[in-house]
Amino acid sequence: MQKGIKVNLALIIVFILSVLVLFINNLTTPRTLSNQELLVNGLFLFQEPKEISDFSFESSNKEIFTKNNLMGKWSVIYFGFSRCPDECPVAMYELSKLAKVLREKDFYMDDKQWILITIDPERDTPETIDKYAKGFDSEFIGLSSSRPMLLNLATQLAVNNSMPPMDNKEDNHEHLDDHVNNIILVNPKGEFVGFFRPPFDISRLSLTYQSVTQSD
């Protein structure tokens, strides 16, 4: 009789622990949002991903970055420039907070990368833009290239960068200030899947980013 009670008690304890584990897992596992929920929270996803043609950019230490570097990873891409007075540092700061929050949550990051592409290649050398990007997070990558290469990729990613090159005035960046401020999302197949729209908020960025990029 006493043995039966112990067995039943053990089964009850196992059941309670199982329920507790499932409850905690539901709390910690990011919820998969519908496309409408994603849109309400600032992430627009295309019905079908868009192909990206090959490109070639350069980071510091003459490291070449091509479409091949997008394969196998979720890539967040932002177009900005190191002398940007307002929008760029705000967006980059929010992305740095997002990366920090994800690490603190032990979110799987091995297949994630964060890229800043300069829209001012005449002044932002690969070393300059990479240093600027890493000023927000040491894992961020800064890239520069020729203006034709920049415009080709920017057009594919729906970023309006059809502006003339910088002139010789050191502090003149007015024609760059109206650039599209979206944050681009590229999937591990190297396809353009959508974009985050401003204003950027860490809670919404974290919610939508985790929903779309969480590993199985």
Question: Where does each model-flagged region fall?
Answer:
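Short active-site neighborhood of thiol/selenol oxidoreductases, capturing the structured segment around
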Residues: 65-91, 95
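N-terminal targeting signals for export/organelle localization
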Residues: 1-54, 215-216
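Short loop/turn microsegments at loop-to-beta-strand junctions
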Residues: 52-53, 74-75, 180-182
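Hydrophobic alpha-helical segments, especially N-terminal targeting/anchoring helices
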Residues: 58-59, 186
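Conserved helix-turn-beta segment immediately C-terminal to the redox Cys motif
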Residues: 73, 91-116
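Short, internal strand/loop/helix patches
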Residues: 130-180
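Thiol-/selenol-based redox modules, centered on thioredoxin-like
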Residues: 168-216
